[in-house]
Amino acid sequence: MRVAVVGSRTLTVPNLGDYLPENVSEIVSGGARGVDQCARAYALSHGIRLTEYLPDYARHGRRAPLMRNDLIVARAELVLAFWDGRSRGTVYTIRRCRAMGVPYRVFRAAEAPSCP
């Protein structure tokens, strides 16, 4: 299963494996700080395929992070969103999941220790 892991840059998820389904075959993320870094570290340390979409500022300007989030949602079969209650990018991604019919789960969190 292709699982997108997205979230606020102020958060980390040191126990990411607790949230992932057992049949995860690929982790999709955005290559940013915080949650995305934890997704990358988990995928690499567990031999799971990692697909990262980076914002293309040259092509999309200020909308680049949102366009990147659209690609992430389109690739995913499930989206795990870790939200700090403030991040507009995470809220945008949740709304895109709804619009595109992609299953998602939202985890509301406070700042956490860094990922391994």
At which residue positions do the language-model features occur?
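Acidic/glycine-enriched connector segments
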Residues: 1-115
